[in-house]
């Protein structure tokens, strides 16, 4: 997301796997006392804003049962995406650490579809 936001015209497409929309819950899960630090979401990474301003083809892949970054974060990124051509792929039954193994076929098909779209096939 950082590269897509910084260099949107140099990116032909964007793939986000297990991306987070909100920094505060993730930091808390990682043991950061966000309240003690006075952390506010608008001081975070701004991933929703970044994805909102990227208009290129976008594929968001997220595990249905992600125990680190909830599927709702992937949905939020998809909903905020400014792309006309976008897809949210939910990998059924997968969690954060086995997303690729659980969804190999659909994962690869989605990437092939994005590449085909970019290449105009």
Where do the model's predicted regions map?
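Hydrophobic/aromatic beta-strand patches that form the interior of the parallel beta-sheet core
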Residues: 15, 59-61, 89
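Catalytic active-site module of serine/aspartate enzymes centered on a nucleophile-bearing elbow/loop
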Residues: 102-121
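Catalytic histidine neighborhood in serine/cysteine hydrolases
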Residues: 75-99
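Hydrolase active-site cap/lid region
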Residues: 1-56
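Short beta-strand/loop motif that positions the catalytic acidic residue
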Residues: 53-55, 59-66
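Catalytic histidine-centered segment of alpha/beta-hydrolase-like enzymes
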Residues: 68, 94-108
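Structured catalytic core of nucleotide-sugar glycosyltransferases
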Residues: 8, 17, 73-75, 88, ...
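Short alpha-helix in the alpha/beta-hydrolase fold that links the catalytic acid
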Residues: 47, 56, 70-79, 104
């Amino acid at each position: 997301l950082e590269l897509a936001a910084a260099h949107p015209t140099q990116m032909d497409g964007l793939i986000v796997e297990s991306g987070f929309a909100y920094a505060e819950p993730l930091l808390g899960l990682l043991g950061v006392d966000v309240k003690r630090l006075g952390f506010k979401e608008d001081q975070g990474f701004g991933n929703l804003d970044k994805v909102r301003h990227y208009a290129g083809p976008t594929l968001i892949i997220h595990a249905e049962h992600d125990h680190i970054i909830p599927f709702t974060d992937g949905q939020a990124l998809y909903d905020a995406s400014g792309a006309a051509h976008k897809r949210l792929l939910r990998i059924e039954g997968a969690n954060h650490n086995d997303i690729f193994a659980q969804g190999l076929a659909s994962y690869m098909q989605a990437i092939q579809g994005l590449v085909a779209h970019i290449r105009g096939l």
